[in-house]
């Protein structure tokens, strides 16, 4: 169906943009971080995350991929403007802080708007959260204020159906020793963090009309992320109709880099926080 959207809740790396260290430097100003504090700057980037909305009858289903450290700020900025109230399900790609650091903030929803939220993740990620967020798994372990009521469901590499949408896990490497998930759904393949994509996963991605791919920074290689150049090379292999780059550091000046990307002869550009795109589910 066409009555569906994807909203970029965040398009930045773990520390987000701006960096406080850049804003407080007295010697040399960081141009991107300085610009990012201006109203509506595309250089303002929170942790990489997306919201998928699908209309079923008169109701919207809201599915989020990852809730990082800046998730609550993203929700404050984006949810009211788009009349988003409840969260139906959350998919987790991995358990770094920029993907799960906002789990605790989900208490605002389960205390005030809905009874519970369903979380979908791999067994090893559930085990990790059981240690880092023990009180969210065993809710009787915490005394005091209300705790988010989360229902954890284990997924593996097999495709699964969620709210009538087919999701295909995309195993990718996030560094040499950590395999994480991207997801293919509808006409989109979403890979937020990767340094290596196998031929097997590449074959799953081929045919996507929209590719959303990690592109940390230009030129300088990184052990756990694609560079801009690596992302462009991969996008050309996939040959999607549109490619959106995400997970950017302050080395990416949004408008300048997007202007330079026009020479690549494919439709590729950095996404920005709050950006909405129509999708097919």
Where are the regions a protein language model picked out?
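Cap/insert and terminal regions of metallo-dependent hydrolase folds
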Residues: 196-281
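Binuclear metal-dependent hydrolase catalytic cores
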Residues: 1-191, 200, 258-281
